[in-house]
C-alpha cells in the first residue's frame, strides 16, 4: 500500500522534557552510551560506578609532574598534564589534553572528557564532565553532569545533599519530580556559565547557554538561554 500525496509520515515524538539530549551534546563525550538507559538526564548518575567497573582499563599516558597521587583504578589519556599535588583516587576515566592542576581532588566514579580543566582546591565525585568544560578554582562537583564547554567560576558549589537527608527532587513550575536519589547535585547544560561563589541547590537543572550571576543561590530549573541576575543593595555610612 502506498501513501497518497496528502498523507504524511508521522513526525518522531520530541524527547521528554528532561531527556539528556535536551541539555547535552552527546557527541561531545566518548561515553555517550552511558546515557542509553537514561530516560531522565539525572538517571545517568546511577550508572557511573557500574560503567567504570566494566569498561575502565587502567593506564596513564599523561605527563605527570612531580609526585601526584594516582591510584591503580585510573585511566588518563595522552596530552593530559597532572600537576604535583593532585590526587586521583578513582575509579576515574580522564580524557586527553586535560589540565589536572595542583590541589585537585578526584574521588570515586568520575568521567572526564577531552580538553577539560580541573583546578586547584576543586573536588569531584560521581560525576560526568563533557569535553572542554572548565572548573578551575575552589569548586565542589558531586553527583552532577557538566555539559560541553560548561564553566564554573571560582568558588561555585554544586550542593548534592539535602539538609534534612530526604530524597532529592527536581522542582519544576508545577510539581516536584522525584528522582530516587539521595545525592544529586546539578545538571549544567552545554556552554552554561555559573559566576563566582554561586551556590546551586541539590537537584538543579541549568539549561544550555544560560548564565547565573556571581553570589547567586539557585535551586530549580533554569531554562536554556536564560540569564539569572542577582540584585542587591549596598548602603554607605560614615565610620565614627
Where are these regions (language model features)?
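Glycine-rich hexapeptide-repeat left-handed beta-helix
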Residues: 31-35, 120, 126-240
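Long amphipathic N-terminal alpha/beta scaffold segment
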Residues: 47-93
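N-terminal short leaders/motifs
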Residues: 19-38, 71-73, 79, 85, ...
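Glycine-rich active-site/cofactor-binding loop and its immediate structural neighborhood
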Residues: 76-117
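Residue-level "contact hotspot" at macromolecular interaction interfaces
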Residues: 73-75, 93, 111, 145, ...
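Terminal amphipathic alpha-helical/low-complexity segments used for targeting or macromolecular assembly
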Residues: 1-67, 209, 215, 224-226, ...
